[in-house]
Amino acid sequence: MLTKTELRKAVRQLKKQHTQEELKALSTVITGKLLELPCIKDADTVMLYCSLPDEVYTMDMIHRLHEEGKKIVLPKVISDCEMELREYDGDADLEVGSFGIMEPCGNPFTDYEDIDVAVIPGMAFDKDGNRLGRGKGYYDRFLNAAGKRGVNEKCESGKGVNEKLENGKGNTYKIGICFPFQFVDAVPANEHDNRMDMVVCGQ
């Protein structure tokens, strides 16, 4: 198995083999599949992200879900090792932030338990839902706070994504998204790592 460093390097090389037009076309397929998932359709609050040039493009999906009346929350990097979530209320709420990508400048969002579905990018994913990030740990800290659902059938079957735990708090369903070449046989992981409940890669 490749180490995390080796796998990140390999994925970066694969990304360089694709043009922006090719990545945008793949993104359309991937987000199209996401939009058809029952858990996305039924969700009240969805966490998404504003994509880097080498990530699955998400702005069209953000616009559509916002137009459908869903609450959209987006990450904002606030330090070298920390991000927070902000509410999205249209493109006027976006400004150029860290890494040169658009970030939200709306109201801070801290009710993590209210997030029904979180769509998470990554450098690589595997069939067990293991995720390899860029190495900064931004999403790892969020995932630790968001809770674990761990039942993949919830999303695919259309069963109530808005089910609550006995204590009244929600249980965020985590979907990893990536390009097909980022879906690998195995991602280095340990028992303490957060796993995705589903991975959508366009295959």
Positions of PLM-derived features:
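N-terminal active-site beta-alpha-beta segment that forms phosphate/nucleotide-binding
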Residues: 1-114
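Surface-exposed, charge/polar-rich loops and edge strands
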Residues: 2, 13, 17, 113-118, ...
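Redox-cofactor binding/interface segments in oxidoreductases and associated redox assembly factors
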Residues: 48-50, 120-121, 201
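A structured binding-face within diverse protein domains that lines the active/interaction site
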Residues: 102-104, 121-124
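Active-site glycine-rich loop that binds ribose-phosphate moieties when present
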Residues: 138
